């Protein structure tokens, strides 16, 4: 069920500004200031309600805190607020207490009594729930002192973890729709396009095309109907940037879509989002409904005569529907298959009408640009890549989560300064950027700047923002196989190069990882990859071979070891190693035998054990449990 918005419709830009002032007065505690008469609560407790923390039972934490405060009669002086993602997903559930900004991590419902007793009654910190700075015994009391946050600059994520995304008044308090008001009251189409061109913003969905030019092209075509489409179909493995924006600040996207509609002369927008994002869908539905109720969507927005509304279209999770022409076909209710280009969507898009498609992060940045001005955005980043970029960090990295950094930040800074380095003291091996369409960059390219052009020059691409980190135990042939397996499975099948070509590549990679590789296989892979990249119909097919080409470029010796020596240097490919116990190191503790899931290890107490190679499934459990380094892969 949706709550009813108890505000009258906003009929002018001036009314919106007045509402912003009134609502911000209720949130002074979150700004580190004293409470006001508008909201007398002495503390505001922000609890992450993003997908990551929700999966770790943050809703139970919130419910337990609310119940405890009510029982203690403290619910009037302490306000509990659900927010979107803070970014530090590996520490969830996260709770931040204002006005001091105390950052508690890995909070459970059972911790609530102690938090209320110590923090709210006695004014003491619950130190065991504070973040411990790596390499020290020091506790960080707030986000400003946590290295993960120190090199970040939040533009697209500016309100995530700050506001309740299900209450439009909190978004308005943080200047939501002010950029729209500015555009509607002081700018025409040419002014809006020039603002985007001056900002230097390029599409964050992977292509990096100048957004101002895209809007300019759509403006240039005349039609009785035009459309604005938001691409929220985030299909890259390990990517969750767009989901987090919609979960934490959906109004930033809605506002930018309305600005786009005003610019190109469209009165209808669509958000295409995958159904696998239930929280994002729910919050987007709430945001659209509340924006309509308050008069920021629908007819005569802010009394300017501009009409614009937004509907949601759910996708079924097909990776190919991230390609804009396939997405538009899916919105039309047809099978999601790419269309030949030209004509481009700006000329013939949704239902053959002029359309522009922008992804979630791009739109979140656009609303910031119209709030702060083009120069503010352009002052961040590099000469050709302005602003910031959001990355979803995953894989073999200590600080898994969502980060937003200025363009030009190096890969090393992201992985080590923000990401906290590689777990277990293992060596960094590669970072995959750009998802299945990108490439793996090795250790000697760690100082590569993260911007559109530098990544392409290095042999990868920006993509939508997935960043998967690999260590010395990862096999690069197996990694290439994983991504090709994904793209082959997700191929729409419309064109032969992608449908059949990726299947042939996958067959060769599978053969190599099973120890059946032959001389000439590498050359076959290169020829197939180049043919597919030049002849596939859409960008997804054209870039499908990139993981193979990148790993061949930087890790060719691993392919050669698999083929010529029948060895996997990383010890990952099960067909190419056996588990062995060194009798001189084995102490006969029986720990490996007791944990083996198939009973492949035999031996008596205090005597060397033996692994039965016939029974062994090479799961690695024995290797993880051995305390004496007696087990190895050979």
Short names for language-model regions:
Residues 151-152, 281-407, 419:
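Hydrophobic alpha-helical positions that pack around
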Residues 91-96, 497-503, 591-610, 621-634:
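Iron-sulfur cluster-binding cysteine motifs and their immediate structural context
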Residues 13-43, 58-82, 99-131, 179-196, ...:
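Ferredoxin-type iron-sulfur electron-transfer modules in oxidoreductases and energy-metabolism complexes
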Residues 2-6:
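Short, small-residue-biased leader/transition segments that mark boundaries at the very start
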Residues 69, 256-258, 408-423:
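Short amphipathic, charge-patterned alpha-helical segments
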Residues 57, 387-399, 405-407, 411, ...:
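C-terminal accessory/binding modules appended to enzymatic or scaffolding proteins
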């Amino acid at each position: 069920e949706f709550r009813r918005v108890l505000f009258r419709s906003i009929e002018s830009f001036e009314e919106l500004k007045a509402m912003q002032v009134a609502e911000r007065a209720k949130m002074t505690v979150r700004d580190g200031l004293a409470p006001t008469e508008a909201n007398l609560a002495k503390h505001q407790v922000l609890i992450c309600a993003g997908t990551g923390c929700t999966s770790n039972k943050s809703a139970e934490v919130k419910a337990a805190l609310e119940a405890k405060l009510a029982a203690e009669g403290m619910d009037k002086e302490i306000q509990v607020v659900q927010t979107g993602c803070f970014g530090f997903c590996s520490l969830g559930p996260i709770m931040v207490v204002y006005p001091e900004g105390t950052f508690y991590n890995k909070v459970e419902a059972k911790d609530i009594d102690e938090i209320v007793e110590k923090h709210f009654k006695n004014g003491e910190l619950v130190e065991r729930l504070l973040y411990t700075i790596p390499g020290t015994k020091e506790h960080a009391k707030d986000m400003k002192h946590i290295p993960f946050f120190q090199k970040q600059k939040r533009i697209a994520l500016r309100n995530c973890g700050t506001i309740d995304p299900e209450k439009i008044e909190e978004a308005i308090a943080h200047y939501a729709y002010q950029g729209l008001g500015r555009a509607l009251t002081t700018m025409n189409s040419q002014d809006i396009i020039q603002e985007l061109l001056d900002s230097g913003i390029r599409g964050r969905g992977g292509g990096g095309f100048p957004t101002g030019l895209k809007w300019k092209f759509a403006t240039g075509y005349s039609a009785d109907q035009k459309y604005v489409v938001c691409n929220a179909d985030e299909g890259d493995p390990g990517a969750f940037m767009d989901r987090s924006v919609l979960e934490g600040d959906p109004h930033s996207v809605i506002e930018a879509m309305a600005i786009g509609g005003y610019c190109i002369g469209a009165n209808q927008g669509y958000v295409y989002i995958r159904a696998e994002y239930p929280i994002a869908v729910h919050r987007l539905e709430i945001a659209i409904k509340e924006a309509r109720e308050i008069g920021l969507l629908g007819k005569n927005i802010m009394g300017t005569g501009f009409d614009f509304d937004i509907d949601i279209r759910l996708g079924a999770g097909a990776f190919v529907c991230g390609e804009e022409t396939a997405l538009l076909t899916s919105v039309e209710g047809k099978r999601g298959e790419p269309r030949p280009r030209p004509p481009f969507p700006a000329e013939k898009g949704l239902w053959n009408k002029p359309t522009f498609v922008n992804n979630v992060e791009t739109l979140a940045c656009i609303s910031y640009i119209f709030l702060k001005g083009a120069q503010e955005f352009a002052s961040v980043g590099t000469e050709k890549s302005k602003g910031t970029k959001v990355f979803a960090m995953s894989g073999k990295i200590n600080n898994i989560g969502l980060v937003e950094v200025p363009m030009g930040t190096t890969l090393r800074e992201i992985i080590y300064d923000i990401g906290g380095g590689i777990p277990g003291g293992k060596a960094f091996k590669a970072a995959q950027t750009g998802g299945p369409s990108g490439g793996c960059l090795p250790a000697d390219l760690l100082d590569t700047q993260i911007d559109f052009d530098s990544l392409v020059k290095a042999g990868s691409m920006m993509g939508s923002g997935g960043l998967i980190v690999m260590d010395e135990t990862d096999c690069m042939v197996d990694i290439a196989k994983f991504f090709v397996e994904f793209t082959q499975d997700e191929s729409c099948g419309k064109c032969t190069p992608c449908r059949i070509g990726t299947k042939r590549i996958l067959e060769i990679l599978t053969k190599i990882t099973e120890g059946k590789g032959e001389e000439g296989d590498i050359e076959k892979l290169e020829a197939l990859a180049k043919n597919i990249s030049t002849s596939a119909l859409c960008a997804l097919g054209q870039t499908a071979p990139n993981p193979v080409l990148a790993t061949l470029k930087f890790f060719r010796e691993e392919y050669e070891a698999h083929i010529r020596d029948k060895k996997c240097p990383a010890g990952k490919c099960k067909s190419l190693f056996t588990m062995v116990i060194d009798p001189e190191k084995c102490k006969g503790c029986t720990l490996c035998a007791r944990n083996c899931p198939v009973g492949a290890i035999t031996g008596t107490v205090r005597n060397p054990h033996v692994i039965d190679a016939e029974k062994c499934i090479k799961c690695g459990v024995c290797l993880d449990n051995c305390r004496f380094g007696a087990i190895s892969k050979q």
